[in-house]
Structures are given as C-alpha cells and as structure tokens.
C-alpha cells in the first residue's frame, strides 16, 4: 500500500492510519521526498496524520530519521491547522539534539506560538523550545533569557514547568 492509498482508505481511522504511515516510513517504502511530493495534494487533516506518524517515529526512536524530515516539519509550525502546528513543534523538539545546527529557523515561529491563546499550541512550543535550550549551542544563547521571560509570564503550570526544568538543565551548561 502506498501513502495515497493509506490517506484515501476510509476504513483506516486515526491510530490505524498513523500506524500504517509509520510502517511505510520505517520499512523504507515511504521517504521524505515522497511525502514532500504529495504534500500539496492532501488536506490539513491528512498532513496532520503524516506529521503525527513522523513525530511518533522521532519520539520513540523507531527509525533514524534524516534531517530532511526535520526541515520538512519546520514550516508547519506556522500552519493554520493546530494539529499540524502541534506535531511539527514536537518533531522539532524530538530532533533538536540530533540536528542542533538545523533548527535555527524553527525558533522564531516557536517563540510566536509560545504566546498563542491555545494551550495545546503553547505546550507544543514549550516542548520544542525546552529541548532546544538544553543543546550546547543554544544554552549559552539569548534564547535562554527569552525563555526565562516566557516562563515567568506563563500562567499554565504544566507549560511553565517544561520551561523551568529545561532552563535548570541549560543553566548547568552555562556555568
């Protein structure tokens, strides 16, 4: 089964569709170039399913994903679709330590999302930014002060705690 068949299969719902996409990627039957090629042919909900599959692979280490997946996900941080924004942010967070030199362009939209009125979008931004700040490259940067300010203003404890834990970790690198 190819990605278009999976996307158009009405019998596959939610987690089964994600599992089918994961299997295609992990088995080598679907690569990032093929995903990029169909990205203009599918709707936001379908793209969110693909991003969700990539996020699960990157989170659980099911397969070694190339930096191309990271670069593919970054523009979706600014998507109109909140599911795409959330999953793209999580992909960046999951892959930040692996590709710290390739996440620069993700930081600005993540900072924008950190002040979004939606809790899920702010949480996803905090997830990614908290993993970025713990990399050697960013622990010593001005991002540290920005995240300190954001954490001081954040009212949601779960989101604030993500920042505080990461800032504590990053402060050890700063010494």
PLM-predicted stretches and their roles:
Residues 2-4, 144-175:
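Eukaryotic acidic, Ser/Thr-rich intrinsically disordered low-complexity regions
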Residues 113, 119-146, 150-153, 157:
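Extended alpha-helical scaffolding segments
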Residues 55-58, 93-94, 130-131, 167-168:
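Structural signature of alpha-helical solenoid repeat scaffolds
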Residues 1-48, 60, 168-171:
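N-terminal alpha-helical scaffold/docking segments in eukaryotic complex subunits
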């Amino acid at each position: 089964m190819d990605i278009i068949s999976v996307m158009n299969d009405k019998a596959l719902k939610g987690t089964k569709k994600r599992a089918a996409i994961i299997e295609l990627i992990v088995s080598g039957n679907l690569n990032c170039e093929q995903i990029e090629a169909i990205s203009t042919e599918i709707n936001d909900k379908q793209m969110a399913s693909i991003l969700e599959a990539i996020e699960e692979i990157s989170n659980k280490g099911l397969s070694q994903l190339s930096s191309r997946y990271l670069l593919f996900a970054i523009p979706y941080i600014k998507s109109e679709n909140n599911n795409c924004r959330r999953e793209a942010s999580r992909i960046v967070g999951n892959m930040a330590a692996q590709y710290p030199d390739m996440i620069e362009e993700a930081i600005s939209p993540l900072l924008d999302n950190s002040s979004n009125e939606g809790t899920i979008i702010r949480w996803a931004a905090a997830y990614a930014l908290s993993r970025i700040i713990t990399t050697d490259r960013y622990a010593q940067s001005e991002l540290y002060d920005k995240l300190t300010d954001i954490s001081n203003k954040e009212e949601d404890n779960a989101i604030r705690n993500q920042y505080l834990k990461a800032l504590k970790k990053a402060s050890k690198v700063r010494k």
